Design a protein with these regions (language model features):
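ATP-binding pocket architecture of kinase catalytic cores
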Residues: 41-155
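An alpha-helical support segment within catalytic cores of ATP-dependent transferases
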Residues: 19-34, 101, 132-138, 146-198, ...
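Short, flexible/disordered intra-domain loops and linkers
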Residues: 11-16, 66-75, 243, 276-286
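Active-site acidic catalytic loop and adjacent metal/ATP-binding pocket
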Residues: 46-56, 182-228
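Juxta-kinase regulatory segment immediately upstream of eukaryotic protein kinase catalytic domains
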Residues: 1-38
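Glycine-rich, phosphate-binding/catalytic loops in enzymes
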Residues: 128-130, 214, 231-233
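Active-site activation/catalytic loop segments of kinase-like enzymes and analogous catalytic loops
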Residues: 227-256, 262-293
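Short beta-strand segments
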Residues: 61-62, 97-98, 160, 195-198, ...
Length: 303
């Protein structure tokens, strides 16, 4: 047995997922299985949902076992398929070096990718000059034109409008605002579904010292309208900077309209709405009677 900790629920996983020594015997067994050299050094990376750390020139991602309450196999297959799709489209992403599962105390799915040194894009943008920002935003727009295209059914989750009706995160807004949101959702179902990354946040794009930016963490890839990409980009990656959003947005459609649609659909749309209410509107999402205050904020800020 390589993993000695006990995982019976999400709290157990949360207590251990950043504990590299707890996962190191497991990682060494995985490296041996994949024919990679023994691990010499490890280092922490930005924490997420799963156990992720650097091991020499690789990044090891060990998915939470099903005993944690998370659907690890689905997340694993989604990310594996998305990485391969990105590679086939020529999108810069760490090369996949190993993928599978190891049956131990629990069944652990894993991915091994190459490690690419770089600065997280959210931090990099804070000190980038105007030319660098323009180039970055242009690169991101062009990359998404390639990525946000149709792909075969059955690979990624779809019908985000239908899922959004059941998404428990929306319980955090008032019943009146939620009723208004549900009035608007049917109009979004007619929008064409394409492949979306869904999590292009400040942490999930890396800017190397040389070369083009790199996209990481494809675990939230789904089929959805292209506007689904916008909330993480505008609210996390760009940190609500309308100047960056205007550099990026090259569609004739008003950005505010597309942003609102993406916000209503997104798996974490309720979290973004809560942030907008607290940071910019000075109200609780429980105090919203309808969505107009949020819509007006988006129109005023983004046009």
């Amino acid at each position: 047995m390589f993993f000695a900790k006990t995982i019976e629920n999400w709290t157990d996983w949360g207590a251990v997922y950043q504990d590299i020594p707890a996962f190191l015997p497991l990682a060494r067994a995985i490296f041996a299985r994949e024919g990679l050299l023994p691990i010499r050094e490890t280092a922490h990376l930005t924490p997420g949902t799963n156990a992720v750390f650097r091991a020499d020139d690789f990044v090891v991602k060990i998915f939470a076992p099903r005993e944690s309450g998370l659907d690890a196999e689905s997340d694993f297959r989604t990310e594996q398929a998305a990485i391969r799709r990105a590679e086939s489209l020529g999108i810069a992403t760490p090369k996949l070096r190993g993928a599978g599962f190891l049956e131990d105390k629990y069944r652990f799915y894993y991915l091994i990718t190459g490690y690419i040194p770089g600065k997280e894009a959210g931090e990099w943008l804070k000190t980038a000059d105007a030319v660098q920002k323009e180039q970055f935003c242009g690169w991101l727009w062009d990359t998404l034109r390639s990525w946000n295209t149709p792909c075969p059914d059955g690979v990624f989750r779809r019908d985000m409008a239908g899922y959004s009706l059941q998404n428990p995160r929306w319980q955090g807004i008032s019943p009146a605002a939620e009723a208004h949101r549900r009035e608007l959702l049917p109009s979004l179902t007619a929008m064409p579904e394409v492949c979306v990354h869904g999590d292009l946040t400040a942490e999930n794009l890396l800017v190397p010292a040389d070369g083009e930016p790199v996209v990481i963490d494809f675990a939230d890839t789904v089929l959805a309208p292209a506007c689904y990409e916008l909330p993480p980009i505008c609210f996390s990656l760009f940190d609500y900077d309308p100047g960056l959003a205007r550099m990026f947005w090259k569609s004739p459609e008003p950005l505010a309209d597309a942003l609102l649609a993406g916000l209503l659909l997104h798996d974490f749309g309720a979290n973004f709405m809560e942030e907008i209410c607290g940071r910019f509107l000075g109200i609780s999402p429980k105090a919203l009677l309808r969505l107009e205050p949020v819509e007006n904020f988006l129109r005023k800020r983004y046009g």
